[in-house]
Amino acid sequence: MTQRLGSSAAFLSAGGYHHHIGLNTWQSRGGPAPAPDMTGLYHTAVLLPDRKSLAAVLHRVLEAGIALEGAADHGVSEAIYLRDPDGNGVELYRDRAEAEWPRAADGSLAMGTEALDLQVLLAEAE
């Protein structure tokens, strides 16, 4: 997160750019939230270039006091999950090189969801 305007807007970026994504509640403030069983956006995923970038983003998210909803190692990728100001899900992730993807004995992809060690990841931000 590069900038936050109270609880009404946040600007996200990677690589030093001022912002790639702007999130705000300017038009929706005070409006009703959709019912939990309604269709709609589940989450937006933002691909980061490498593990060091994911670590740097995690550091900034935590420094800004934004709560994480989760963190996972999917075998092919590592991801952190949070909510935007409107409550929409945001996934920030990095892909592993295809040569590192987990494979079953028959060669098929063996993705999963394991805990992501955030302390080990954060050490890469330093």
What function would you assign to each model-found segment?
Residues 5, 35-37, 73:
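Short glycine/proline-enriched turns and hinge-like loops at secondary-structure junctions
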